[in-house]
């Protein structure tokens, strides 16, 4: 009985520590989303929102969020990307 109680205590402590390790937030310098390639233009009516990638990413990018919760990377230098961003900002 004592062995199983001790084993249970060790197991519970291990699980608690494991949970803390994997639920900890990333450091402030860890980018959350980066674009490694750019997608093609999609119709504006499918776009719900956007955000810019971190400056720590290897290349600049804009990530458009579609109404179906998909993410599409785009080149921020493209004219259509800038137009979509302007429209989204005006309608916010």
UniProtKB/Swiss-Prot annotation:
Domain of life assignment: Eukaryota
Keywords tagged on the record: Chemotaxis, Cytokine, Disulfide bond, Heparin-binding, Inflammatory response, Secreted, Signal
Disulfide bonds: 34-57, 35-73
Signal peptide region: 1-23
Gene Ontology molecular function, alphabetical: CCR chemokine receptor binding; CCR1 chemokine receptor binding; CCR5 chemokine receptor binding; chemoattractant activity; chemokine activity; heparin binding; identical protein binding; kinase activity
Main localization of the protein described in the UniProt heading: secreted
Signals that turn on the gene: By lipopolysaccharide (LPS).
Compartments where found: Secreted
A Pfam family the protein falls into: IL8
Single GO biological process annotation from the record: signaling
Any one of the GO CC terms: extracellular region
Family statement: Belongs to the intercrine beta (chemokine CC) family.
Protein role: Monokine with inflammatory and chemokinetic properties. Binds to CCR1, CCR4 and CCR5. One of the major HIV-suppressive factors produced by CD8+ T-cells. Recombinant MIP-1-alpha induces a dose-dependent inhibition of different strains of HIV-1, HIV-2, and simian immunodeficiency virus (SIV).
Subunit description: Self-associates. Also heterodimer of MIP-1-alpha(4-69) and MIP-1-beta(3-69). Interacts with CCR1.
PANTHER family: C-C MOTIF CHEMOKINE 3 (PTHR12015:SF183), SMALL INDUCIBLE CYTOKINE A (PTHR12015)
Name the UniProt record assigns to this protein: C-C motif chemokine 3
Taxonomic lineage: Eukaryota, Metazoa, Chordata, Craniata, Vertebrata
């Amino acid at each position: 009985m004592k062995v199983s109680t001790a084993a249970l205590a060790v197991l519970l402590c291990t699980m608690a520590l494991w949970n803390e390790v994997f639920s900890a937030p990333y450091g402030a310098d860890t980018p959350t989303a980066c674009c490694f390639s750019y997608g093609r233009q999609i119709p504006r009516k499918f776009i719900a929102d956007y955000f810019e990638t971190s400056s720590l990413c290897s290349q600049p990018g804009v990530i458009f969020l579609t109404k179906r919760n998909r993410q599409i990377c785009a080149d921020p230098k493209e004219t259509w990307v800038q137009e979509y961003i302007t429209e989204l900002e005006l309608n916010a």
